[in-house]
Amino acid sequence: MGPPKIGQTVVVEVPSTTANIGPGFDCLGAALDLSNQFTIKRIEGNAERFELIMESTEGNHLRGGPENLFYRAAQRVWRTAGVEPVALEARVKLAVPPARGLGSSATAIVAGLVGANALAGYPLPKEKLLELAIDIEGHPDNVVPSLIGGLCVTAKTATDRWRVVRCDWDQSIKAVVAIPSIRLSTSEARRVMPENIPVNDAVINLGALTLLLQGLRTGNEDLIADGMHDKLHEPYRWGLIKGGLEVREAAKAAGALGCAISGAGPSILALCKATKGREVSVAMVKAWEAAGVASRAPLMSLQLTGSECISNTFG
């Protein structure tokens, strides 16, 4: 297939994600109904030209150029497919705030993959895009649900290949995500984790993950409450989130079934019945306010479609 023509434009929407969801460290993630929109255009210039236009003050620190995640993902698609690379412009309507534990980096990677694949005439199947996304990100729990939607478990098999399973999520269970004004980088959140963990902690997490998945499948409140329990990463990370433990306890007191750090944080995920959503949201915001941190806590639903190319036109 030939390279995209100058002026060709695609529009890609990519959902936010909440990863880990308590015990599913680096393997469990869910797409949520808050999305970034990327308008991607072939422009004149050599293949190393990449212009990034952010339509949000949240993204003012982000830059174009060859090190940009979006650009790197687009280049991987074209190299893999044998398509001549081209200069690009990406205009981003940013709804997913960076460095908050909602998969903002994953949206950039997925948008680069999906957008470049669309511009080139879809030479690569979605399975290949999944493989590339995991390789670029380094772990699957955000990029997989961001690409395909839903609640996803991703595991590496004994033959060193990735297997993805989409799991059921009962529609009566909603997610309240408290998003603070403070930031926390994934690299910082990973630095505090130990290199080795006790076997007993791993066993506890295996059991908790099983309970959580069954609870989400059936809507069983007790199973969800017992399953939202982690020993692998959260004990080391709560100390990085100002007021985080108080927000967690406030959410539970207001009716949340369980709470977890969303991804690497600092956002906090609470699972609850829809009827408890407003109470949980208000309680989390007030608890963070008491700690001197501004926040918002929208009630979210599972996003089932994943990333979508909603337009492919010539300018």
From Swiss-Prot:
One Pfam match, given by its short name, reads GHMP_kinases_N
Q: Which UniProt keywords apply?
A: Amino-acid biosynthesis, ATP-binding, Cytoplasm, Kinase, Nucleotide-binding, Threonine biosynthesis, Transferase
What is the predominant subcellular site recorded for this chain?
Answer: cytoplasm
Q: Which pathway does it serve?
A: Amino-acid biosynthesis; L-threonine biosynthesis; L-threonine from L-aspartate: step 4/5
Q: Does the keyword Nucleotide-binding apply?
A: yes
Q: Which reaction does it catalyse?
A: L-homoserine + ATP = O-phospho-L-homoserine + ADP + H(+)
The Gene Ontology CC terms held by the record are: cytoplasm
GO MF terms here are: ATP binding; homoserine kinase activity
Q: Does the keyword Protease apply?
A: no
InterPro entries, sorted: GHMP_kinase_C_dom (IPR013750), GHMP_kinase_C_sf (IPR036554), GHMP_kinase_N_dom (IPR006204), GHMP_knse_ATP-bd_CS (IPR006203), Homoserine_kinase (IPR000870), Ribosomal_Su5_D2-typ_SF (IPR020568), Ribsml_uS5_D2-typ_fold_subgr (IPR014721)
Give one GO biological process term: threonine biosynthetic process
Which protein, by its recorded name, is this?
A: Homoserine kinase
List the source organism: Prochlorococcus marinus (strain NATL1A)
Organism classification, top ranks? Bacteria, Bacillati, Cyanobacteriota, Cyanophyceae, Synechococcales
